Every structure is written in structure tokens, then in C-alpha cells.
Amino acid sequence: HQVNIARGGEWIETRLLSSGPRTNPWMAECSDRIIQAGDIVSFDTDLIGPYGYCTDISRGWVTPGKAPTNEQRDLHATAREMISYNIDLVKPGMTFRELADRAYQLSDEFIPNRYAVIAHGVGLADEYPAIRYAEDWDKYGYDGVIEANTVLSFESYAGRVGGHEGIKLENQVLITETGKEVLDTFSMDLIPE
């Protein structure tokens, strides 16, 4: 927060950091639990930074000291595949409903704990649109058109009900006339270099 303010930023909107069992389900604040070697550590941070623009990313890693378990690799692969699939799918002129209908389909074991939206707008804050899953469309969805020069944050969370851990990932993407540009460059690897 201090660095953001010193550089002309305004406020922190989200600051979730959790490890091990506190990563599942998502949205748990950090605690006094000491991070252990081999724990997943996940964070989600949004801030209104210099010039009044929002930055919103999430990452999850395995803490050094132990190799990732097969479960951790599976969770990470699911979350990463979902993000990649949905980013590859989006294009200008696509409706919100088309994205919802064609978006990555999580297996049933992940649906109860999934993140609330496939993607949401980013500009001066986390904002319109909030693109819901096809299963939630009748209750929460609304249609619109994804336009060129729109920034969307694509979200994913993979954590099983009753599972030990979960992985949260998020990328900001500029939708252009000719495609898209991922705006954040921080590694999405399970074990960052």
C-alpha cells in the first residue's frame, strides 16, 4: 500500500493471501498459520494504482522445500487450462452469453467451489461486465458485447469440496481489434523461477 500511494496510486481493493488448507475454499484471509514447505500459497490482489487504473491478478505456487504433490499439479493444471482456454476463446464482437456457453467446463468436483465469474471488466476498478457461467446465467447473467479495447480479468479457481488446497489464477487481458494481449507478465508456473 505504501509503495502504491508513494507512486500516486489510490487504494488497495483486494488483498487475499493464504496458504495450505486456507486456500480451499477460496476467499479466506490469511491467519497466523506458518507457511510450510510444500504448501500452496495463493494470492489475489487488486489495487487502484497510478493514474487511477486498476490492476487485478492472482497467482498460486508451491512453497519451496518439497516437490509438488500430484494433487497440487492437478489443481494447478486445471486452473491454468481454464484461464488459457477462456482467453483463447474470447474475441471482439462475442456476446457475454456466447462466452458463457463456450467457456471451459470444469468437472463436477470443482463446480461447488469455483470462482463466481468467468471474467470481469477492469478499468477504474473491478467493474462491468461480470460474465457468469452458463449454469448461473438464468439467475445472474446479462448479455452484452465484448468490444475491442476492453480489458477483462479472466479468473479461475480449482479446489475440491473437502479438498486440502486450491489454486487461484487470474490474468488481465486487453481485447483488441485483431486479438488479445495479456497485460500481466508474472509467471503462472506452479514453481516459479
Task: Walk through the language-model features, giving the residues of each.
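Active-site neighborhoods and metal-handling regions in enzymes and metal-associated proteins
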Residues: 1-193
